[in-house]
């Protein structure tokens, strides 16, 4: 059933209005003193700053700074980077902001494409022109609902939008439209397991509650030049986001990073998003607090009480940044409290390669943001029929796929092999693997039918063997060629044919790898695998046992000292004789196992 649902999800048109799969890189926002909006032409054609110096992108500056710190030893990881600090309890809550996979923006019909020129996709409302009105785009709701279903949330039949007021250069209206009071989804959960990367002390599973998921609009992308000039790209304004708010139920940095990683995987698997943290499509804010073990403090949030004073670290753009920033802030708060100080509620920042967080501003509360219902946007009404239709069309989750690949008798992969198939190439490698197993099953059935009449060799290749070839042999070819995954380069049926031939001992393992390389390089001349094997004389000619023994006797007579060493217990040297026998026989036609058996019989 899961396999069938996977096929439908990957091949059939989904019940959604998803857009093109485009990618963009998002530079971190910084607090700047001057603002300037420039067009695509001026920002792309001029690579000099206002003082005539070469312009260096902010992301490259940060990477260079991080590298310099590592070289000088100033960027070393905290000595207390373990998951726990004796005598202290860490508590973390996470807010994940994810860009939805849609064609249009949330409140205008402007394109939500990621790779267009700066300020090319901007409506009047995006720039807060006087008199412009928000126009909610219903299609943006579909991927948001898919995300809520993936987290097992209770989808609200009616939700409303609110205004969150603040003044910053990336928000021209002076407020952000979000869903503070009545979000569209509540009360979900996320389960984390050891294979997700949780801390060992968290045991076999961790349940992280999802308080709510709300839709909201994104802000502009800002870029600071060295001359105190700020470039603003309003393409990103009003792109649809969802904010996933977890309960503060995480108690280790590693588990917090695993939580964000699992959230991204779920969002991608259900088709809600098409870019992750690595491309700027997902950002995380973390709330960090500490308290002495067993002590009840006076603070709390999201319905959880008894916590220490929390601080919020904004705009973390990688899984490692999530873990490292939490470690640094935990250590800072513990040092403050042990020194007799008081942790202040504030918003802090984290820089790549840093060893400490930095204060940005005092932590705002709901009163500071002056939340109010947006009078220009009506309620969002979601019917039960739509929710059920989306629910039944959902593809299997990563956990369901993992169970299928590791527990189904047809596959029986290890967790270490199953996870890359699920996580790599947007499931394209997994689909290729399933096709290859299907093709191999057909070949096995044909061979079994022929065996009843001609006593053919028994087929022993399994889904586990196919997994090894897909991940390691074929994956290695792509890696060495520095090429992106392309299943058409070696059709799944061709790989299955190679695995079948070597599994039935019609060709040797080295011949199989050579065939795979030939097909990968496109040097097969349009021939099938079977035609290459037959026409190039690659079929394994079975040697009689007497021939193996004769070759073994010859090579052993040439190395009597090695024979004596093996008899004295140095069994590893048998491989030398096997190699010599393979060289004596016709190239690629000696079975290593039978050669070893012949050597052992003479010992």
UniProtKB/Swiss-Prot annotation:
Any one GO CC term of this protein is: glutamyl-tRNA(Gln) amidotransferase complex
**Into which family does the record put it?**
Belongs to the GatB/GatE family. GatB subfamily.
How does this polypeptide assemble, per the annotation?
Answer: Subunit of the heterotrimeric GatCAB amidotransferase (AdT) complex, composed of A, B and C subunits.
Annotated Low complexity bias: 31-48
EC number(s) from the headed UniProt entry = 6.3.5.-
Entries under InterPro entries matching the protein:
Asn/Gln-tRNA_amidoTrfase_suB/E, Asn/Gln-tRNA_Trfase_suB/E_cat, Asn/Gln_amidotransferase, Asn/Gln_tRNA_amidoTrase-B-like, GatB, GatB_Yqey_C_2, Gln-tRNA_amidoTrfase_suB_CS, Gln_synth/guanido_kin_cat_dom
Organism phylogeny: Eukaryota, Fungi, Dikarya, Ascomycota, Pezizomycotina
Query: Which residue intervals make up region (Disordered)?
Result: 12-59
Q: What is the extent of the transit peptide?
A: 1-32
Which subcellular locations apply to this protein?
A: Mitochondrion
This chain belongs to the protein called: Glutamyl-tRNA(Gln) amidotransferase subunit B, mitochondrial
What is the protein's species of origin?
Arthroderma otae (strain ATCC MYA-4605 / CBS 113480) (Microsporum canis)
Q: What does the entry give for GO biological process?
A: glutaminyl-tRNAGln biosynthesis via transamidation; mitochondrial translation
NCBIfam families registered for this protein in UniProt: gatB, PRK05477.1-2
The role this protein plays is: Allows the formation of correctly charged Gln-tRNA(Gln) through the transamidation of misacylated Glu-tRNA(Gln) in the mitochondria. The reaction takes place in the presence of glutamine and ATP through an activated gamma-phospho-Glu-tRNA(Gln).
Carries keyword Secreted?
no
Single GO molecular-function term?
Answer: glutaminyl-tRNA synthase (glutamine-hydrolyzing) activity
The enzyme class is ligase
**Pfam family of the protein (one):** GatB_N
